[in-house]
Amino acid sequence: MGSITHNKGNQIKKKLDSFIGISNWESLSIEHDNINHQLDITLLAIIKDITNKPDYSSCTTTTTTTTITTNNNNNNNNNNVNKNEDNSNTTNNNLIKSINKEVENSSVNNNGFISMNQQKQNYHYNIPTSLKDIKSIIIKSQKLKGQLQSLKQVFKQNIIINNQEVIEQQVDAIKQQQQQQQEQQQEQEQEQQQQQDGESISLSSSTSSGITISSLSNIEYNPSIAFKLGKEFVIGNLFIDQIILFLEFLYGIALEIETNLQYWESIEPTIYYLQKSPLFWLKYYHQQLNRRIQFSNKFSELHNLKQPKPILYISNLLNKVNSFILNKQPSSQQVEQQQQQQQERDEQQQQQQQQQQQQQQHNNSHHHHHHRNENEKKKKSKRIKHPKIELLDKIQKLKSYQVVISVIIGRLTFLLDSLKINTNNNNNNNNTADNNNNNLNDNESIKRFSELMSKSSIIIFDSLLLFNELFKKNKESNDNDKKVDDDDELIKLSKDLINEIINIRNEDGDQQQQQQQQQQQQQQQQQQQQQQQQQQQQSLQLLNFKILLNNQNLINKLMEVMVKRLSGNLSIPNVFIRNWVKLSVGSVIVFFGIKYSYDNFDSFKQSAFDIRDAFIRFYHEHLEEPLLNIWNVIRYDKKSLQLADPASLQSSIDSLGRMVIDYNIDRNHLDINSTETRQHLFQLASRGDISSIMKSYESNIRSPLQNILFGDMIRLILIQIQKEKVDVDKAMVAIDKLLQANELNFQLLAAIPSAIFLALLIWQIKKLFTNQKKTLPYSQLVIFQTLRKINRTLILNNTQDQQNNNLPNFISPLLLTQINILNYSTIINNQDNNNNINNINNNNNNNNNQLIKTQFKPFEKYGTILISTNKLRSHQRFVRENTESQWFNQDVHDLESEALSNQDKIQTINRMFQTYSFLKNIK
């Protein structure tokens, strides 16, 4: 998930912690106000779980004592909470109880996904392998729901605290501190006069500072105040956690939808036709024949025509087939009906022992069973679509899901930013106040935050309604005969929730007017007004908790429905469905291959041994021996390449010299006793110079036949042959020296081809068992495509009307604004101009088009960019260079910023293409 959302959530939590002002909650371990102490223990356990968790974002380095997250909390002690309801009979509590009944007993048509009876269900469902990444998010959401359910009795408990007494305690503590400082100064003056040791001075200062700290921290020691502020602390943190978890789930679903959409858009219709099984085509053409026969029957009846015999024959066959199919169905239907009747009887017996609320729930469940039966019948009679139309429907559904998810991500991210701005404004206002009024300012900040939280909860509820409307539209497109009522029970539930907020806000406004009129009255009346104001705040707190729990139930149900939808028809088919033709043909080939090998087992065995011997020979000759020779050359300088023997060359040279000397002696050309002449001729012959016998060879060649028979012609020829042999041996020795000098190169040339072949073989085998989506080239391609998509989105939106593309200054509901609620826009709107949540126009029904332009299209663009940047961050780990990784993170943060214009973001993308090396090498 994007770090921008994590950073915003952490900032809001830190501001909320500064409003609360309590870092030690151990005072909740003390019994107080005659309430069940188990509630304090439950609240303290959840607060400890919240404060002990790290921040969301790993990129933030600052840590505080209130780093908060509650996603992984699992409180086993929460199941032992005893029920202890408040006995107060105020009008606000009666309203809350009545709304609670309506919320628990409300449900929605089966067209959507929302059902308020899901609190009793366990959302343990199978998650496909393609959605395993969001499994942890679903588990965190379920744990968050368990936390909220364990806090029901805690938020029903009301405590009245006198704020004036707390302020007086702080004023007294400040006075005591001033008196202690004066006494300390006097003691120091006396000690200086008496010239005492410095150790006593340090001891006195340390004791006085300890008294000051204890006097200033009286709020942390008051269990009543800690219980009240603890509920605000918990509900605020759980609210932020709910938004973060919802956004994490939407980001994961958006990536899954994008991958599925890319697959269905890239697939060719012919390939999709081949993916369909023969049974599907039989059903499809059976349906088409039925429709043709029905049309021909009606046409012939209307025009009083006789049908031809082939059509009659085919219609009779189809009637027999249809009757055979229909005769099999009642048995299964009867079994299902009997099982349903038994379940209904068991439910009726249990419901007779319960209260009227459970009877209403039974009626709702019976209503759901009735709708289920109708849906089953419609599914059986559902028309089978052609694969081409089915493919277009899948693409259309995925695109509609993508648009709605982009809008909701943009709206919720903008909502977090609005909460951050408002909390910062509240904090700035508190910093300008006096020190004596900090507690009052913190109470006002907490009250304003609770109001913002109630408004934001309505925005979240409205986002869930968008999904519900989307699912109903998809079902309407499939079931044309089914009509959906506009005023369904979900809209009634939204009316009840908003009317409750209106009533509480009205009572709150009346109470504020009464307080302004009674400011000059006595202190007892002021205390009563403060108590009434606290009751109103606690009722608003309880309402926020109920809406928060309601939204969490709906979010869990949405997660279940989205996972089922994306793992069903809209998901990418598995390997067996995609390649069933190849697998079937391959299995046939394998079968005949096994049969042939069994029939010719001996020849197959012999060929297998031959192939094995060939691989062994290849390994020894082309891998093992060249590598060993390379090692011998490098390590031992061992020469293995040699063509001629140097000793043989020397013997040939000596033989040639002796031949030349003997010939010269025989022909009296040389003195026998002259050693110097002999050595001279021998040296000339060893160098290849036989000029001493060439004159005799020239004279003998004049009469070759005579000299061959009676002369020295043959002897001279043999001497020349010996001379040529010596020359050849010298050349071979020279070649040996050249080979030995380049022996390492020759061995490398012998080993490289086989090594390359083996490396390619290993690479192909490794490629079969590795996921290509986790490689660097794939990540580079994804980053390139994502940046292109962002650039295209910004350019297309930049060419349109600029006013309709910029984010608005406020956020308002989309579906809830179409409900006619009295005084909704005047009461829900915050009177302060700094608040930019839920500022709705008065004429909502007349401004639907303007609402879509201002509250839908800009957030769709913003959400699309956020989804794309989240995808960039998921592939950022493949950017190996540290400097480029830091720059890449900064550029992605600039693309996520809502402060930059479209032109600035386009320039950022151009800079990214020109800067990063991994984007330049993509072909």
Curated annotation (Swiss-Prot):
Keywords of this entry: Membrane, Mitochondrion, Transmembrane, Transmembrane helix
Physiological role: Involved in the mitochondrial expression of subunits 6 and 8 of the F0-F1 ATP synthase.
Family the entry assigns: Belongs to the NCA2 family.
Organism expressing this protein natively: Dictyostelium discoideum (Social amoeba)
Domain of life: Eukaryota
InterPro entries in the cross-refs: NCA2
Region (Disordered): 69-93, 182-208, 335-385
Feature: compositional bias, Basic residues: 364-385
Name this polypeptide is given: Nuclear control of ATPase protein 2
Name of the coding gene: nca2
Low complexity bias locations: 349-363
Gene Ontology cellular-component annotations: mitochondrial outer membrane
Compartment annotation: Mitochondrion membrane
Transmembrane segments: 745-765, 808-828
Membrane topology label: Multi-pass membrane protein
